[in-house]
Design a protein with these regions (language model features):
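A generic short-segment signal for beta-strand/edge and adjacent turn/coil regions
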Residues: 8-9, 18-20, 61-65, 127-137, ...
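Compositionally biased, low-hydrophobicity segments enriched in charged and small polar residues
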Residues: 12, 16-21, 25-28, 69-71, ...
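Aliphatic-rich helix starts adjacent to a transmembrane/signal segment
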Residues: 1-62
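Broad hydrophobic/π-residue packing in well-ordered secondary structure
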Residues: 1, 21-24, 31, 126-128, ...
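Surface-exposed loop/linker segments characteristic of extracytoplasmic
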Residues: 71-167, 202-204
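Solvent-exposed N-terminal domain segments of exported/luminal and surface proteins
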Residues: 28, 33-34, 48-49, 61-86
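Short linear sequence signals and composition-biased patches located at protein termini or domain-edge surfaces
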Residues: 36-39, 56-58, 65, 83-88, ...
Length: 213
């Protein structure tokens, strides 16, 4: 085989393999994109579940400690929504509730006890803030979803649940007709996740309160 024949053979092989290599690279990139998307969806679903659980328990009163003679404004004390106060105009919200006779947990998994309350009420809050430790102007993959809860001295503590949160919105919507529950309120939660490059995932969930008076 002459040198010319070798060169021709190599060229033909390259022509045949090049499309296959491009397809393989494209498939690999799509696989990575799919895995990143699934991870973002999983994180968003976890966050929405935690926030939904907090809304459902908002306003819970233990019958053993409940004082019916004490009038409270449930809309102000048990659940509060603050619009456009967080990262990139994200909303935030907080809830308060009494402790049940069982085992309750806050948004970071701490078992709730009396020393983690204020005025016998547990507190949970959710807000999106800029990622800590990142210089201003640096490119980041969204903000951080912060869980606000009380420590064993009843002091407010902030804990990062996850990064990659681009936006959080909380909207109160009309209660379902025929619910017959004047205290029930319904909220739409929306969470936009990002990898900071190309991917953006948006998930929503509708949650109704169960314990408001």
């Amino acid at each position: 085989m002459t040198l010319l024949e070798c060169l021709v053979g190599i060229t033909l092989c390259a022509l045949l393999l090049n499309p296959l290599l491009k397809v393989s690279a494209h498939l690999a990139a799509k696989q990575v994109e799919h895995e990143k998307t699934q991870l973002l969806i999983s994180e968003a679903e976890r966050a929405l579940e935690l926030m939904g659980r907090a809304i459902r328990i908002a306003g819970y009163q233990n019958i053993k400690t409940y004082n019916p003679s004490k009038k409270v404004d449930a809309s102000k004390q048990f659940i509060q929504v603050n619009k456009k106060v967080g990262y990139r105009g994200s909303d935030s919200f907080s809830v308060q509730h009494a402790l049940s006779d069982g085992v309750d947990f806050d948004c970071i998994g701490n078992a709730l006890t009396k020393d983690r309350t204020r005025k016998d009420l547990a507190y949970q809050g959710f807000v999106v803030e800029r990622q800590a430790g990142v210089a201003k102007g640096s490119k980041v993959n969204g903000g951080s979803l912060i869980c606000q809860s009380l420590d064993r001295q009843g002091r407010l503590q902030n804990t990062t649940l996850m990064n990659g949160v681009n936006h959080l919105f909380v909207e109160e919507i009309q209660s379902p007709r025929g619910s017959g529950d004047k205290g029930q309120r319904v909220y739409r939660l929306g969470l936009q996740m990002t990898d900071g490059v190309l991917l953006q995932v948006h998930l929503e969930r509708t949650v109704a309160t169960r314990n408001l008076p």
